[in-house]
Amino acid sequence: MMSFGSADALLGAPFAPLHGGGSLHYSLSRKAGPGGTRSAAGSSSGFHSWARTSVSSVSASPSRFRGAASSTDSLDTLSNGPEGCVVAAVAARSEKEQLQALNDRFAGYIDKVRQLEAHNRSLEGEAAALRQQQAGRAAMGELYEREVREMRGAVLRLGAARGQLRLEQEHLLEDIAHVRQRLDEEARQREEAEAAARALARFAQEAEAARVELQKKAQALQEECGYLRRHHQEEVGELLGQIQGCGAAQAQAQAEARDALKCDVTSALREIRAQLEGHAVQSTLQSEEWFRVRLDRLSEAAKVNTDAMRSAQEEITEYRRQLQARTTELEALKSTKESLERQRSELEDRHQADIASYQDAIQQLDSELRNTKWEMAAQLREYQDLLNVKMALDIEIAAYRKLLEGEECRIGFGPSPFSLTEGLPKIPSISTHIKVKSEEMIKVVEKSEKETVIVEGQTEEIRVTEGVTEEEDKEAQGQEGEEAEEGEEKEEEEGAAATSPPAEEAASPEKETKSRVKEEAKSPGEAKSPGEAKSPAEAKSPGEAKSPGEAKSPGEAKSPAEPKSPAEPKSPAEAKSPAEPKSPATVKSPGEAKSPSEAKSPAEAKSPAEAKSPAEAKSPAEAKSPAEAKSPAEAKSPATVKSPGEAKSPSEAKSPAEAKSPAEAKSPAEAKSPAEVKSPGEAKSPAEPKSPAEAKSPAEVKSPAEAKSPAEVKSPGEAKSPAAVKSPAEAKSPAAVKSPGEAKSPGEAKSPAEAKSPAEAKSPIEVKSPEKAKTPVKEGAKSPAEAKSPEKAKSPVKEDIKPPAEAKSPEKAKSPVKEGAKPPEKAKPLDVKSPEAQTPVQEEAKHPTDIRPPEQVKSPAKEKAKSPEKEEAKTSEKVAPKKEEVKSPVKEEVKAKEPPKKVEEEKTLPTPKTEAKESKKDEAPKEAPKPKVEEKKETPTEKPKDSTAEAKKEEAGEKKKAVASEEETPAKLGVKEEAKPKEKTETTKTEAEDTKAKEPSKPTETEKPKKEEMPAAPEKKDTKEEKTTESRKPEEKPKMEAKVKEDDKSLSKEPSKPKTEKAEKSSSTDQKESQPPEKTTEDKATKGEK
């Protein structure tokens, strides 16, 4: 096999270039097999080198062959050429060359063969070596197998040994466990033994201690025993010697012994001395040396110590310097600290002083605040007094109106349009400013109410006072009627100057007069009945259809149905709401103003509780709680309750907007509030007013307005026009109820709707009170005669019960102020109602401004003629309420609760007069008024007589005014509307002055605030007079301005004078004088507003 491979290699080697280089190597490596891979790899280097050499040799030889072939070819070409011989010769040469080349090639082949053979031999040797190696590897496999078998046996043996070891380990572990158990047992035994040993050791120690003690004792006893023995022996020897006696022998022996002893002592002493001297010398030398050494040592130590001392001294000096520096710094810091402490103490002192001063200032401010509050209360009281005076004047005016209307009915001429609306526009403008201030007052009242405590028992007292105040309101309404008549007379005079009344205004007064005539015709019993004659408000309650609301609203005045339904004009709420024009809701719904519950919420009208609660809901506690009446705000309200004028002031403050927009109050209240137009229908259909009144009546029964409305109920006209009756009661009660709600619930005044439209705030209250007033109206409507008498009796009871409402309803008086602020015409119809003294509050509410402008515009002469007596009566009444008010404010200051009671009593005092007047007026015509008089306190009977005479005078004056007012109304309305803005500005200025005057006067005394209020009132009067003058300006501006200036001067002087004098001035016969009285009334209204 190897030979074949070698031969193949030898043969194929030359041709390797043709077949490719590595065929030989491939074949060899392939044939070598797996066994010869290593040998091939090992000999690859030599083999490849040979292959390369062989290939190179072979590659050279073909070139030789190719060279020979090319030479022969060249010879062939030469021989074939034309020169054949030359070619032959050349061919011969080329053959030789070819032969030589071939020979050379052959020689080369031989050499190559030799080399290949040698190489083959070497390869055979390698192959043999490889075979040997393969055989050796087979032997190694066997060796490996043997070793593997041996190792496996060893592994088995080791496994067995391991198993044995595991068993041994387990046995050892068991032994260890046993040993541990034994160890534990031994440890326990050892511990026990140690404990026993310790116990024995302690016992041994104790025994040893006892033994030592016993040994000591024994030793002591032994010593004592030896001592005793020696002592005993000595005693025995002495005794023996004494017994034997001393012999001579013994003496000699003793002497010899003594001599011997002496000799021995001397020698001993000599020896001792010699020894001592030697010892002394040695000791001295030793001591000297010792001292010297010691001295040297000490000197060295001293030197060292001196160095240390020096360094220490230096350090000490340094430390001293540092200490001094520190001490100086410390002193400086102490000084700074002391200075800072001083500064701190000074600052603290200053701070404390500042705090004390601030506290003092706070206390002063508090005292000032309280004083201002009391002053405001006193001013409200003064305003109430003024309103009382105005109410008296209204009553007189109403009486005159009734007389005039009665005369007209008798004569038979148709009602002439009144210029009631003319004076009103001026007033509403004033009322707007009044509203602004009234809202502020209401806020103060609300604060005071918050401070007060609500007591149900007090509410009853307040109700009693409300009944009294209702009577006062009636009287005041009678006064307002008189004032309205005077105002109408003035308007007539002005109308003569300006005889261009708007058709609507002319129509409305005519309608009012017609409606009054109709009402009088309807309720001839009323006009005839002394009660009706006495209560011209009831006789005029149909006239209330004439109520300024309709008279004011020319549209309503045009609509005969509306004038016919005096309920609307009568409804003081309407008169109030016209004044409320500021409160668009009230202006829009004069019906609401009339019976806010009717127009605004029939449900409220239906729900007397709701009617009651508008103010009561707002401040039910206020309406209910005399404490609120007691509350400083209510202290003001009690004062207002005492003097409905003051109560009216908040309403007037609310009604300034109403006064500002008299036209709105006139027409907007009625035109805007179809409810009013509807309410006239209600006035027309007493059944309807009755139902709202019934719905409202529960509240009205509570409200003194009921007492007022019963009077209206007394008037058959009112029974006929229950709406009118309701409205007068409403006007009365709304005024009263509104004011109480407002006075009681400044929250209502605060309530944006109420604050915005104080008239509305009042009107909701009015809605409540109208309902109350309506309830008596319902009774009256049900049984005009019965309602008149029984309801009067009932309502007086209600009034007695309701006086709290009236006490609460100083704002009711306020709402009447709204009515007054609305239109003199409305005030006039209310005045027609006011003869009853029920409407006086309404007329007062209406007349705060309404009566004033009518007085200013219509006929100061009439006012002069009519009001002197009436005003005197009113002033007397006002003086009484003022006194009561003054008392009550003081009491309120002392105690918030007591003042309401006192206020109720005071109210009862002034109101009995008004109630007596009203009740007696009613008593003359009817017996029903008598129960009212009894319930209301049938105090003076003379006053009712006066009121009846005044009512007659008022009727006569109203008839005259109706004629003149028709002419004056159109011009006056325009003039008044122009005067409104000016009046508003003037009122605002006067109110600011009044507030300033109030603030400076801190005294708690009510008299001082009253004085301040009085000057403020003249200023307001001036503003109102200026308004009237402005209204007259189109006709007589220069003249009016001069008059206003004179009036202002007279008023500025007059404020300090008593209110009675003011009332007298208002009733003065001269126009100028009548204007100042009007100013006084206006001032009163403005004060109430404040």
UniProtKB/Swiss-Prot annotation:
The modification Phosphoserine is found at residues 74, 122, 345, 416, 419, 508, 523, 529, 535, 541, 547, 553, 559, 565, 571, 577, 583, 589, 595, 601, 607, 613, 619, 625, 631, 637, 643, 649, 655, 661, 667, 673, 679, 685, 691, 697, 703, 709, 715, 721, 727, 733, 739, 745, 751, 757, 763, 769, 783, 789, 795, 809, 815, 834, 859, 867, 888, 947. Residues 522-892 are annotated as: 52 X 6 AA approximate tandem repeats of K-S-P-[AGISV]-[EATK]-[APVQ]. SUPFAM superfamilies: Intermediate filament protein, coiled coil region. Residues 456-1090 are annotated as: Disordered. The modification Phosphothreonine is found at T839. Residues 291-411 are annotated as: Coil 2B. Residues 496-506 have a biased composition (Low complexity). GO terms for molecular function: protein kinase binding; structural constituent of postsynaptic intermediate filament cytoskeleton. Residues 131-143 are annotated as: Linker 1. Signal peptide: none annotated. Residues 243-264 are annotated as: Linker 12. Residues 287-290 are annotated as: Linker 2. Sequence repeats lie at residues 522-527, 528-533, 534-539, 540-545, 546-551, 552-557, 558-563, 564-569, 570-575, 576-581, 582-587, 588-593, 594-599, 600-605, 606-611, 612-617, 618-623, 624-629, 630-635, 636-641, 642-647, 648-653, 654-659, 660-665, 666-671, 672-677, 678-683, 684-689, 690-695, 696-701, 702-707, 708-713, 714-719, 720-725, 726-731, 732-737, 738-743, 744-749, 750-755, 756-761, 762-767, 768-773, 774-779, 782-787, 788-793, 794-799, 808-813, 814-819, 833-838, 858-863, 866-871, 887-892. Residues 412-1090 are annotated as: Tail. The keyword Coiled coil applies. It comes from the Eukaryota. Residues 144-242 are annotated as: Coil 1B. It is found in: Cytoplasm, Cytoskeleton; Cell projection, Axon. The keyword Repeat applies. Keywords: Cell projection, Coiled coil, Cytoplasm, Cytoskeleton, Intermediate filament, Phosphoprotein, Repeat. Transmembrane segments: none annotated. Belongs to the intermediate filament family. There are a number of repeats of the tripeptide K-S-P, NFH is phosphorylated on a number of the serines in this motif. It is thought that phosphorylation of NFH results in the formation of interfilament cross bridges that are important in the maintenance of axonal caliber. Phosphorylation seems to play a major role in the functioning of the larger neurofilament polypeptides (NF-M and NF-H), the levels of phosphorylation being altered developmentally and coincidentally with a change in the neurofilament function. Residues 265-286 are annotated as: Coil 2A. Residues 99-130 are annotated as: Coil 1A. This is Neurofilament heavy polypeptide.
